[in-house]
């Protein structure tokens, strides 16, 4: 199974990339993690709908057919660590690859958000996108460690 993290926005601070890379290399070979950064649409005088459409096109191009789409959304379902671990286990048993989508500064196209298989929320707080990448990969690693009985997660 592969976890594909699709993030709108290419540039993150060095500390965030270092942290992301550290967690990404910890995953076992049977659970591959890949990051695809897609270009943020330049604002200029474009309407929000135009921005959404351009970013949606790039996001959809980054996600292979047959992949389960999970969007990160402030209105999504909040999960505990144990609940995310169960979700990860369910995804693995389902056999499909999973794309977790992080929207751009303006969020995600509402129709794309609605069409996703799932909508989850990492926090009730508004977080910078670099922090979301790090938080998401850490929580996915933690969920894996819960399922694997690895000592990383402690109760």
UniProtKB/Swiss-Prot annotation:
Where is this protein chiefly located? cytoplasm
Q: Name one GO cellular component term.
A: cytoplasm
Q: Kindly give the InterPro entries that the UniProt entry links to this protein.
A: Alpha/beta_knot_MTases, RlmH-like, tRNA_m1G_MTases_N
Q: Do you know which CDD domains this protein is assigned to? A: RlmH-like
Q: List the molecular function annotations (GO) for this entry.
A: rRNA (pseudouridine-N3-)-methyltransferase activity
Q: What EC number(s) does the entry state?
A: 2.1.1.177
| Major enzyme class | transferase
Q: Where does S-adenosyl-L-methionine bind?
A: 72, 103, 122-127
Specify the domain of life of the species encoding this protein: Bacteria
Write out the annotated subcellular location: Cytoplasm
Could you tell me what this protein does? Specifically methylates the pseudouridine at position 1915 (m3Psi1915) in 23S rRNA.
Report quaternary structure and partners.
Homodimer.
Q: Which family does it belong to?
A: Belongs to the RNA methyltransferase RlmH family.
Q: Which PANTHER family does the record associate with it?
A: METHYLTRANSFERASE, RIBOSOMAL RNA LARGE SUBUNIT METHYLTRANSFERASE H
- HAMAP family in alphabetical order: 23SrRNA_methyltr_H (MF_00658)
Name this protein carries in UniProt: Ribosomal RNA large subunit methyltransferase H
Q: In which organism is this protein found?
A: Acidovorax sp. (strain JS42)
The upper taxonomy is: Bacteria, Pseudomonadati, Pseudomonadota, Betaproteobacteria, Burkholderiales
């Amino acid at each position: 199974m592969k976890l594909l993290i699709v993030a709108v926005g290419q540039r993150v601070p060095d500390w965030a990339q270092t942290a992301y890379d550290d967690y990404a290399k910890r995953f076992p070979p049977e659970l591959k993690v890949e990051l695809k950064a897609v270009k943020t649409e330049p604002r200029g005088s474009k309407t929000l709908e135009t921005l959404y459409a351009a970013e949606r096109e790039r996001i959809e191009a980054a996600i292979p057919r047959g992949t389960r789409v999970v969007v990160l959304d402030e209105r999504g379902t909040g999960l505990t660590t144990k609940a995310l671990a169960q979700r990860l286990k369910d995804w693995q048993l389902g056999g499909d690859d999973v794309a977790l989508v992080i929207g751009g500064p303006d969020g995600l196209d509402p129709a794309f958000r609605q069409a996703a298989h799932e909508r989850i929320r990492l926090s009730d707080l508004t977080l910078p996108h670099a922090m979301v990448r790090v938080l998401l990969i850490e929580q996915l690693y933690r969920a894996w460690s819960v399922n694997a009985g690895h000592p990383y997660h402690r109760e």
